[in-house]
Amino acid sequence: MLPITRRHTLGLFGATAGSLILPRMTFAQGKRPSVTIAVQKITNNNTLDIWNEQSNVGERVFFPNFWEGLINRDWMGNQGPVAGLATEWKRIDDKTLELKLRQGVKFHNGDELTAEDVVFSFSKERLFGNTEPKGGKTIYESDNKPTTVKELPAAVPGIGRRLWPALAGVEAIDKYTVRFHNATPDVTLEGRLYAFGSQITNRRAWDEAASYTDWARKPITTGPYMVGEYKPDVSLTLVAFDEYWGGRPPLEEIRFVEVPEVASRVNGLLSGEYDFACDLPPDQIATVQAASGFEVQGSTILNHRVSVFNTQNEILANPLVRRAMTHAIDRQAIVDALWGGQTVVPPGLQFDIFKTTNMFIDGWAAPEYNPQLAQDLLKQAGYKGDAIPFRLLNNYYTNQTANGQVMVEMWKQAGLNVEIQMKENWAQIHDPEGVKGVRDWSASANINDPVTPMVTQFGPNGEMQQKKDWTNAEMNELSVVLETSTDRALRKKAYARMLEICEREDPAYQVLHQNAVFTGMKSSLKWKAAPAFAMDFRSNNWTM
């Protein structure tokens, strides 16, 4: 059995620090190696834009090899903040953060990184559209309709306001100094800068692109690798950027290939076609480890698997039915049967890293497995056995199909009639046509504060509310408290109340288990897996 490691993050606040496509790994004389990585999916939206592709699969291909922020996440360490494109930062006040840029950083097009690029990366044109820096109000796609091919996709401004609800703008103090101005106080500004989305792009490349799509399929960034070739739904090849500020990249190319079936990823790895095979379910670990010259690395990560409810469904509009569904699931049985005990059932939508900021709610737990209580709640609700649709993807998440089948059987034993509807992609999952019911999802802690994922995913501009799956007025009021209050005790009290609302009184979701990632690889490769979806191929994580 693989050891499961837990990583704790640093605090949020103040810190200083100073095209040939190769089918497999090749060692040529005087040349760096290249690797091929089999993944279940490269991106969901067929773009390489961090704001448009906010996904687990996106994390894998984006970080830390391609996109970089002013503050970076310590992917191979405690997942806390480390200096990136900024060398130092300081608070001016509760609403203002100043950062000094690293000098001499080159973009992939040869331009030097300056304050102008940072200002642009958080501008209305690049990110916020016609939105205003006000929290607590849901922004829908229909509020932002592009009128030209150069404008942002309708969803992006609302996604931007998930992470930056009150950012009023970024000011260039001089060529290498910027100030972030928030409309409200925010104790998590530093954390938001190393969260998924806050990475920096080149202004000139955006201006020169003929359309948003052209830009988004080959963004110009500062990372150690740049886009060589991108074939949506097929492959992505990143090539070394030898002018990288952090030193010469160790690989010539990183090629991600889309291989949806687990068996095909495993067989391709063992045959030598691939150097890495991602998202292996635990029942495949022994197969890979038994083969000479191969190993599996993995751990739990800062992501929880959840199932979420659509309250426009007449049956699920009744919170008693949703509560019944949460008490009908034996989470530990799922962990034991499908994960071989290699992950855990967390205490609701909480992560151990919240303890570093004293925001962890002790004594809280996921809903207990209690089929009798579930049956009693259904009786109180007057449930008559009508079908509840369960839109399901085929193993987008590890073990997803098997997990869905197990849950349907558990619901059946409690008297719930849940019917699986297999879908091919996320567009079909979210299709407003037809009747929605329950679906799978996951929730990530991008920083060590519950503003992610509680507010960013379930608050007024979380996907749940933007897609009109669920809403709760008190939850939205508390989201503003979590986003704007500088009173730590008040913030913690608000978070505790959010858990009560979202997991007990008016369920938006139910947490199933902490996610874990397992990657099969050639044992000869001197590389270590991060406790994340991300795969680090920088020089400090690759040796020959």
Residue ranges of model-derived segments:
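Extracytoplasmic/peripheral linker and loop segments enriched in polar/acidic and small residues
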Residues: 170, 320, 335, 367-368, ...
